[in-house]
Amino acid sequence: MFIDKAKIYVKSGDGGNGSVSFRREKYVPLGGPDGGDGGKGGDIVLVSDPDMTTLLDFSYKRKYKADAGEGGSRSRSYGKDAEDLYIKVPMGTVVKEASTGKIMADLSHENDKVVVVKGGRGGRGNARFATATRQAPNFAEPGMPGEEREIILELKLLADVGLVGFPNVGKSTILSTVSNAKPKIANYHFTTLKPNLGVASIKGLEPFVIADIPGIIEGASEGVGLGLDFLRHIERTRVLIHVIDISGIEGRDPYEDFLKINEELKNYSVKLWDRPQIVAANKSDLVAEDKRFEEFKEKIQKLGDYKIFKISAATGEGIKELMAEVSKTLATIPVTQVEIKREDLFIPEEKRFTYEILREDDGTFVVEGSFVDRLLGSVNVNEPDGLRYFYVVLKNKGVIDDLIKKGIKDGDMVRLNDFEFEFVI
């Protein structure tokens, strides 16, 4: 099964907690604090793998979590950093942040990597908090929480040439004729429901990768049917072979088909519409006279400088000449580099610990937020040293000043989660 889009949840590892420990050795009565720092949590890293061709694996597993860092221990022993979690994705995968739709990375080359969530920093052990006036700190920091987010993976095929056209015009037959690809072929609409890749190997020509894109229908650029999913796969191609059914056996006009497909390409992306097109008038073996082809060719050439070939994928007529022109055109076009504008990029915000101050009906001032959770997790407010450190942090972070601005007075109660104290200026 070909899967070209997936949404997954990723969470990096939490940092390990710092240790509260005191040196206790024979003959060392005043050893002091010796708690070590916690280890860093594991990152989650996506890496492109040329051996993968689909995002099918992400249909079965959608949640990925890296390991937490190890906690610190006595004797200033640092906790071990967790190993990073590497997740393989196909080359050509675009990574987007799900909530914003912004691009995090475009993994177009072998072994391209991107860190999608960073592991949390390890907490500091109590040995770090010893000072001349605080010689036996009875608290340590917890590890920082890891990052988490949902990301979208979109696979855009890496092909030199894209075969485009309405359903049932013979694209799959052309691909099977010029390569070893074995796409499903039958005489009904939407036979191809997934892109197929093949390497065109024609004697005397440089090989190139060609993609059979499922048939585009009217309204594809607006998402009708599977239009947007199909169009995405030709964004990276350098040349388009526009396949037309010249026979008209299904009652469609070849010229009108040409105009309609180009309208869909233009609506989806002007750059895509402006890409070099070589026109392949297929199923010529079903046309008794050349007049139909010549009339079609004359109309198309009035629209622009198009190279037009009369071919039959069934009999092989004109195929080598068509591929020779494709090879010649490719030689003049550099490999497409995907440009990502800065405004389209997802740039993770620096993690900040915030708080807000509310006042309840009974007059109690409530301070809540991620800052409060982290602070209370890092100190033992039941110990004198911990309580003093707690107050210093509130003062340094501006919480005390903000409480005063909110109108707090001596004797008012302040609550941070489950911890309450009486305010004294």
Swiss-Prot record:
This protein's GO CC annotations: cytoplasm
Chain residues that bind GTP: 165-172, 190-194, 212-215, 282-285, 312-314
Any Pfam family matching the protein: GTP1_OBG
InterPro entries in UniProt: G_OBG (IPR031167), GTP-bd (IPR006073), GTP-bd_Obg/CgtA (IPR014100), GTP-bd_prot_GTP1/OBG_C_sf (IPR036346), GTP1-OBG_CS (IPR006074), GTP1_OBG_dom (IPR006169), GTP1_OBG_dom_sf (IPR036726), OBG_GTPase (IPR045086)
EC number: 3.6.5.-
Chain ranges of the OCT domain: 345-425
Highest taxon listed in the record's lineage: Bacteria
Domain spans labelled Obg: 1-158
Residue numbers binding Mg(2+): 172, 192
Subcellular location, record wording: Cytoplasm
Names of the cofactor(s): Mg(2+)
SUPFAM superfamilies, alphabetized: Obg GTP-binding protein C-terminal domain, Obg GTP-binding protein N-terminal domain, P-loop containing nucleoside triphosphate hydrolases
NCBIfam families in UniProt: Obg_CgtA (TIGR02729), Obg_CgtA_exten (TIGR03595), PRK12296.1 (NF008954), PRK12297.1 (NF008955), PRK12299.1 (NF008956), small_GTP (TIGR00231)
Function of the molecule: An essential GTPase which binds GTP, GDP and possibly (p)ppGpp with moderate affinity, with high nucleotide exchange rates and a fairly low GTP hydrolysis rate. Plays a role in control of the cell cycle, stress response, ribosome biogenesis and in those bacteria that undergo differentiation, in morphogenesis control.
Similarity comment: Belongs to the TRAFAC class OBG-HflX-like GTPase superfamily. OBG GTPase family.
Protein's UniProt name: GTPase Obg
